[in-house]
Amino acid sequence: MAHCFGRLFWYLEKGDGSMALWGGRFEAGVAEVTQEFGASLPVDKHLYKQDIAGSKAHAKMLAAQGIISAEDEQAIAKGLTGIEQDIDAGNFTFDINDEDIHMSIESELTRRIGEAGKRLHTGRSRNDQVATDTRLGVKALAKELMEANLELRHVLVDAAKKYDKVILPGYTHMQHAQPVLLSHHLLAYSWMFARDFTRLKAAFDAADNCPLGAAALAGTSYPLNRQMTAAELGFADVIPNSLDAVSDRDFLLDLHYAGSVMAMHLSRLSEEIVLWSSSEFGFITLSDSYSTGSSIMPQKKNPDFAELIRGKSGRVYGNLVQLLVTMKGLPLAYNKDLQEDKEGALDTARTLMQCLSVMAGMISTWTVNEDAMARECGVGHLAATDVADYLAKRGLPFREAHAVVGHLVLMCEKRGCNLEDLPFEVFQEASPLFERDITEALDIPSIVAARTTEGGTAPAAVAVQLQRAEAQLVVDEGVFGSLTKVVEMGHGAK
């Protein structure tokens, strides 16, 4: 233990015998087991670029306000740049005894540039520092997810264009319901992911306010220019309440929620891929690049990656629930519990980036088996609703028409045939309103073509919908391109 008063106010012996940066009030070092238990460095080291950017902006503002000298600010900026370059290159060794990314960088900065490094933390607490790092990180993660979201939507729209004449059964309760265009089905997912993009943008916006200057919880007596720091870091504004600034994690929950809904959409699509690629359906054949085999059954071609995407949704949901439970009992302002806020967010973003990329690859390389889809359109009485509509359009109340066609379906099931297989005489016996043109109501392409309402599955309606989906992509790409300055995630922290 160093007893020099000039060091004691700033350092405290850590578990390894070196000094901590917060220890003036303590006489004993932390236990070795708590040193590792309390350290957040294994997680928050991935925010090193955000931490360095925040420190540069803070130092620049301190110099502009006359709180530190221009020479100190220049030394700090140069030192931080050198540290960032070393981390980027994989030439920086993180020490668990430094506790977190803030202490790791600050202690190394002080080692490199001396006294000026000790002035960096003037007017700042780790509470507002970590909140700033995390907000910058969420903006970067949301942006990455938005970009991957756009890429998947392009794949879906391209597939919808390619398969604009392919018809397959639509399902309710996993039972044959009505025929739809495959393009219509794929566009349904495109719209789901379009809503996800909007939620991701909302999470980005929720994080786009700067906590720096809130200090520990009550603000500071230094004449800080919070607006300058916020602008330097690309934030839209400052957070108006210092207590809220250091303790709010709603923006992280927004990212988790947006990610969870998107994971749910990915899981639903994955479930259909698993079903469609099965022998029972045979609607699609997955590329070998997106399938695996069995260690014992030579014939197997498994949709493992679709299943993994489906399974990983639970992991993403768990991260959302974890943070909700962590937050629900915290009084104002900062509590150490908040250290648990970052690992789940990083995991969710990494998981979803992989899922979005794999899904895009699966769809862009699959083979659609049009004959299998057409075959299934010939079973399950997909024309039943249109036969009922045929009678209703001729004056029979729809509920009575429904009963008539239900009786015909029952007759088909007893005979082991479909509605289109019934002789015309059987239709006339069921209702004198049936005429020879009933065959048009039984024709699958005609049924699809008749669904001309806005948002319907008729080719003409789907063509309009496709234009809207493409236009929405253009709008969202514009939104993506106009995002405020973002400190991108670094990949040098090993």
Model-based region annotation:
Residues G15-G219, L224-A231, T292-G293, D304, ...:
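A helix-coil-helix interface module used to build multimeric assemblies
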Residues R135, K139-M146, L150, V157, ...:
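Short amphipathic alpha-helical segments with heptad-repeat character
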Residues G234-V325:
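Acidic, glycine-rich loop-and-beta core segments that form the ion-binding/anion-interacting portion
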Residues S18-G54, E115-A116, M297-K494:
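Glycine-rich cofactor/substrate-binding loops
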